[in-house]
């Protein structure tokens, strides 16, 4: 087994075991107060030699295990894309529940009603532009944004207006935008991503996917396109959810490949460009689904819950291996290794495979509602949904003193190249309701 690939499992399991075995009960509200007479020590007293030894055991076991990879393989190869409401999403719920029962977890399915949006025909072509060869058109590769409404059956044919950002759009008189297809031409900042700020780069670009269609509609646009968000090009469109504002008309919305967005922008600089656009997605009635909840009961504080999680649903244009099959599999691996090594967590470990993170977050919202009276007993919540490459460390949304208490674990994680601890304002979409309720998030 390639140990480099398994480091993500090792890092996640070490973090989980720290929270299970090391932090005091009140760690989420205050740091451990040192004795006034004690000598300074780089290791807080909450870490016993046995705890640190268990962390090392977990690290080695995780590096040598292929359990998580086998789970991802089944989710992607045997089930496939898992868009909320689909048959594949339902099969994934059954599979993950069965696997977690097999390793000895107490498993239940908690009902969630999820949006059921389905993709339809997606075609576009440039039918008129400066310098056009006679009797030709230019094919444009694109996909509908999640939740998009459809064009009329025969499509829309309109001039394309290219804008760089919201400010440029809002500065234009309405008559210049009305009746046009608006293309937000905002390239993903690959340099920022290369410097370790991929999340920030993604966030800067994704606002045009989330809010672009409504902003274009307010100005009279008949459809909205964005330059696909992300660093991978290869003429592949990148989908994601668009968030229609309640006070704006809903217009068809899509993502154009980076290469085709570049083409359109270049042609528009030379003269007017007209596009024929056909998108036929459909929103069906909400469908019944479930969050998968799997517990390893705590030996001393079973009422206190530590969540380790990933989201089981995925977009339909890929197999959902990275987003977020890997996150679900790593969470399952954490439980698997704790059971395999016969460790007895003090607090209840709750593995959650969330449903509907991608286009509604219905699963996390329903969990927060169903467990509202128990939120005060949620000791910590962890989510992995940031990719499946080599991990660099752990994000922390908690009391800053908690970061200091993590120093011994960071030292062990660094042996796998994943020892960076970073205080952040937000850790994950699915644990956000718990974050807002004051639960420490990782």
Describe every region a protein language model picked out.
Residues 1-13:
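Bacterial N-terminal signal peptides that target proteins for export
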Residues 11-22:
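Bacterial N-terminal signal peptides
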Residues 40-47, 51, 61, 73, ...:
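Noncatalytic luminal/extracellular "stalk/propeptide" segments of secretory-pathway proteins
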Residues 52-54, 128-130, 141-174, 242-321, ...:
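Soluble metallo-hydrolase cores and metallopeptidase-like ectodomains found primarily
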Residues 55-63, 77-87, 158-163, 172, ...:
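Second-shell loop/turn segments in exported
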Residues 63, 101, 131, 153, ...:
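Metal-dependent peptidase/peptidase-like ectodomains
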Residues 70, 336-362:
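Short helix-loop-beta-strand segments that form the rim/entrance of peptidase-like active sites
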Residues 165-231:
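A conserved hydrophobic secondary-structure block that centers on an alpha-helix together
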